[in-house]
Amino acid sequence: MANFPDSLLILNGKSADNQPLREAITLLRDEGIQIHVRVTWEKGDAQRYVDEARRLGVETVIAGGGDGTINEVSTALIQIRDGVVPALGLLPLGTANDFATSAGIPEALDKALKLAIAGNAMEIDMARVNDKTSFINMATGGFGTRITTETPEKLKAALGGVSYLIHGLMRMDTLKPDRCEIRGENFHWQGNALVIGIGNGRQAGGGQQLCPTALINDGLLQLRIFTGEELLPALFSTLTQSDDNQNIIDGASAWFDIHAPHEITFNLDGEPLSGQEFHIEVLPGALRCRLPPDCPLLR
């Protein structure tokens, strides 16, 4: 391990006092591995630290946090227009860690850290929304977005991904479907959507497999729509397989256009974006990411 190039870890401020992480980094440094550590405090820090990583000449920038941290770091990396672009390493430290979990990143800190530094760097896709923002994992709309956006931080901290489901059940009487129209390559649908998932990755909301067949290096986005007028019957019906379920609509395309007669909100790796018109397109091979050899998200 001692011959591997330098890395820079961008650590979410919520994990700054993580003692096991501090010990894992110390052990690797004792092996001769140079790991720079920078802690985020406010929005925009990740971009500044990626710029610093380039000046330092590191080969890997590690995102230490949840899906939001991974989104910030990966978005900063794909904005690099010239020179060598560092690879992305993943260190899952958030509440749900949906992208890292579905990619097969080890839960053990020391193993995840070693993979982030020394793992094979594979080209993976990202997605751009309305030419101004991006996501690496998934865009979710409807019921799922309102739940993940409104779930209290204390509940998430105490219960992790299960908190989203509990908060959703508590709010069930106020949740209504979104009327919208969705177009893609050889795809057109119009109706009432309770949940919309457009995935580069497979899961969101604390482990919910919204796009179970998505791959991150196939140049496509997977779409899944949960339809219906009433939430509770639709949720029960989704316990069946999608092949037998009239409340589930699936699609795949390099792009999707979404129009709604009223404002709807999409959650992009944890960041809300509201509007009536959305153009979502895949960015093939947008960056390199260090992944396990048996990563289920690779074709």
UniProtKB/Swiss-Prot annotation:
Annotated EC: 2.7.1.-
Location of the active site: E271
Coiled coil (residue ranges): none
Main localization (coarse): cytoplasm
GO cellular component, one term: cytoplasm
PROSITE patterns with a match to the protein in the record: DAGK
Localisation: Cytoplasm
Keywords assigned: ATP-binding, Cytoplasm, Kinase, Lipid biosynthesis, Lipid metabolism, Magnesium, Metal-binding, Nucleotide-binding, Phospholipid biosynthesis, Phospholipid metabolism, Transferase
Lipid biosynthesis in keyword set: yes
SMART domains, alphabetized: DAGKc (SM00046)
GO-annotated biological processes: phospholipid biosynthetic process
Residues engaged in binding Mg(2+): L215, D218, L220
Domain of life: Bacteria
DAGKc domain residues: 2-133
Cofactor stoichiometry and binding remark: Binds 1 Mg(2+) ion per subunit. Ca(2+) may be able to substitute.
GO MF term (any one): lipid kinase activity
Cofactor(s) named in the record: Mg(2+); Ca(2+)
Family: Belongs to the diacylglycerol/lipid kinase family. YegS lipid kinase subfamily.
Function: Probably phosphorylates lipids; the in vivo substrate is unknown.
Cross-referenced PANTHER family: LIPID KINASE YEGS, SPHINGOSINE KINASE
Protein name per its UniProtKB record: Probable lipid kinase YegS
Protein species of origin: Salmonella arizonae (strain ATCC BAA-731 / CDC346-86 / RSK2980)
Phylogenetic lineage: Bacteria, Pseudomonadati, Pseudomonadota, Gammaproteobacteria, Enterobacterales
Gene name linked to the record: yegS
